[in-house]
Amino acid sequence: AYDMAKITQYALKNKKFVEVFDRYQYTSSDGQHQWVKKVIYKSKRDHIDTSMIEGCKSGYTSKAQSTLSSLLNINDHHYVCVVGFSKNSDGYNHCTVNDTLALGNYVKDHYSVANIIKKDTKMNSVKIKNGQTNKVDVITEKDIEAVLPNNYNPSDIKYKYHLKDLTAPVKKDQKAGTMDVYYRDTK
């Protein structure tokens, strides 16, 4: 599933892929034939709300069995979700869609976007060579947001700076480096 998620994440950078991935229905160029995404069509037919699934591709292999790679929209943020080894059983049909929706609902109920650093926050300072002053503050250029558990502890967030010394003259808004943000050791 991880490999499929990485492939989907990469493919979503291609506009043509997104156009096909997001479409629910296709019509042939001569207008004679139509295709629908059966996995979504059958779920909607059985009154399953699939609105959080913005795009998807289903498949089957003997190894992974029924799979669904999808793009979920949860509170206006997009997540790639891949489920595999899904099996229909008595009372549990549309397994790949239901598994995907269960994961999406879990994310919606337990995670949210947190603004962890506001724009123009002083984060550090760097040395300046040949300047009238020997250091300058490093300020964030924009708000920094992250998807975190609803009950996260701010002390679990750590920052790792990759800063470089600057040489005068220093221009306003000159980039001084980068910063990695970690939540409980996960970047």
List where the protein language model places each region.
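Domain-terminus/edge residues, biased toward the C-terminal soluble/receptor-binding domains
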Residues: 2-187
